[in-house]
Amino acid sequence: MKSAIRFVLTLLLLHGSIDADDVSASPPLKEARSDYFVIYTTAHAGPSPSKVLTLCEELRSELCRVWGLAHRAKKWDPLCEIVVHTSAASYLASVGPEAAQTRGCSRIELHNGKVSRRRIDLQMDVDGSLSALAHELTHVVLADRFHGKPPAHWLDEGIATLADSRAKQLLHERDCQDALSSGHALPLQQLLNLEGFTSPAQMPAFYGQSLSLVSMLARQRTPQQLIDFAVDARDSGYPFALKKHYNINSVAELDVKWRAHAKASRHVGPSSPVLIASLRP
């Protein structure tokens, strides 16, 4: 299942979301806090909030380490709200019916160049696990690095997918290869600038290509340099950032290199992308 992420550039809340003051309303909730998180779980059926808090702290530290953000890991203000739902009805009441095919939804609000709200809603899996947590927390961790602007959609989703299970990654890799074989792969000029889908048919190719491109660029240099590249691309454009970080002269040249990489990957079989092994279930 795909995740959902919402970047909001105002202080207004989307219809159906829960304010922090409302999470203590019915049903009763348990709570745990740290310098980064406030965890809410259902009192009678939910997991231990302290255990969820420990997992969140471990994941945040590992994400910061892998992506070179540890030196930027200041105390979050506001804290990231993590709301664990034990039923689909509760989850969808918070995130909206459009997220019915997801297990997690992250919400990041930006105001005056700063993050003004962080929130993740999670639907607990049947076995009691939180399979969407690592993916959604990746979005929240990355948000602080982009100078009060949303990161590019391809980068945000590609990196978050690296925190998914290998089984999910293989499905995205299959979609990427299918798009290339059928001629429906998105040109990278379109992929790099795509912020919204014009057709549901774009989605499999987008997610598959995003994972493939993120993996290629992170391997070619380092995961940390990929983040620096993305920040420069956001602030100064892709031609400048590609030349500075990868000695690539244009998006067109990147497209050629990526297609060659994807073709080679098809022949050698599935290979593990940049490892965040400790985040995988």
Predicted regions and their residues:
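Juxtacatalytic substrate-recognition/specificity segment
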Residues: 21-152, 204, 238-241
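Hydrophobic h-region of N-terminal signal peptides that target proteins for export
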Residues: 9-18
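Sec-dependent signal peptide recognition
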Residues: 2-10
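Acidic/His/Gly-enriched intrinsically disordered linker/tail segments
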Residues: 97-121, 128, 147-281
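Histidine-centered active-site/metal-ligand motif
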Residues: 15, 135, 139, 157
